[in-house]
């Protein structure tokens, strides 16, 4: 039965017992649903969670985690976790990734309880500050560890979506961001990196604060699109197995996004997406790609097929490509195309990826002490530099000292 097509045509058919049979089928398979969570870590991540909440994303639990109790209080989410409340007293990390890391480790049990039982976990965070940079990798690790400890046959898929600072934000923040991305690569299957400078090229006249909101909107729309294409009926579905095959072990990834309402709108939207890359890499360096279209009700499958021909022409012949499309009446005549490519190389941000994924400098033995453990100190470079051979105290060190802890 083409029930949806009949419904869209304004035809209502009511066969005796049909609804009862349909209900029985739904009940029989309801236990096999895909469980999805979106976890926002730190201020930027929390902003994305609030935006997703306002957008009404269907099919995912929204979880906010932060060291800043005040920001967490105004974040709209289904679950909230205050990280390291005995370390920061809910006052934030002071921009220090070390404090973000310690706070997340101190709240490991609460994090594990919040992320248990999911098949796909998105982690959103801004790289370069304290909580997102330091805590997000810990959250990613705990997602994996919790599943293993509970005897899960298949580990959850962990996809991190992060922003990389503007160059104008300074070298210290950029170095912190690089460090955070390197650590996220340890425990995330895929890390999608949105370079703020590339974002600004799309909307160069936006004030800085508006540019940050635009980044939040982009991440929220991307996550919403993937979640709802998996969970809801679409014109062409991307199922969980498709996402898993593209994202599992995908490593660094980029997103390109484009829109068009021209006569050749689907093709133009894809070309715009391939041009408007959010990370400075060359297309063709990626190994796999996920393409998602958001379209109005009048877009034909033929238009989408022509657009996909462009994708196949632009990407490497060896690339594995999955695509899907869903209808959103609010799009009107506009087509939006989103391209996510995994396995990319970006020397400026990532350098030698293989060298960065050596877990010996990140995985600390289970008997670690959170405060005063020299093994933890080795994980954190001196982001602030030094003078005359002496380490410059960080904001995080000051917070820990104020709370009575020894400096790391």
UniProtKB/Swiss-Prot annotation:
Keyword Lyase in record: no
Where's it mainly located? cytoplasm
Write out the GO cellular component annotations. Answer: cell division site; cytoplasm
One GO BP on record is: FtsZ-dependent cytokinesis
List, alphabetically, the PROSITE patterns matched. FTSZ_1 (PS01134), FTSZ_2 (PS01135)
Which residues are involved in binding GTP? 130-132, 169, 173, 216
State its location(s): Cytoplasm
Q: Keyword set for this entry? A: Cell cycle, Cell division, Cytoplasm, GTP-binding, Nucleotide-binding, Septation
What is the top-level taxon of the source organism? Archaea
Report any Pfam family annotated for this entry.
Tubulin
Keyword Plastid recorded: no
Q: Which GO terms describe its molecular function?
A: GTP binding; GTPase activity
What is the annotated role of this protein in its UniProt record?
A: Essential cell division protein that forms a contractile ring structure (Z ring) at the future cell division site. The regulation of the ring assembly controls the timing and the location of cell division. One of the functions of the FtsZ ring is to recruit other cell division proteins to the septum to produce a new cell wall between the dividing cells. Binds GTP and shows GTPase activity.
Give the UniProt family note: Belongs to the FtsZ family.
How is the quaternary structure described? Homodimer. Polymerizes to form a dynamic ring structure in a strictly GTP-dependent manner. Interacts directly with several other division proteins.
HAMAP family linked to this entry: FtsZ
Instruction: Read off the NCBIfam families from this record.
Output: ftsZ (TIGR00065)
Listed name of the protein: Cell division protein FtsZ 2
Q: Which gene encodes it?
A: ftsZ2
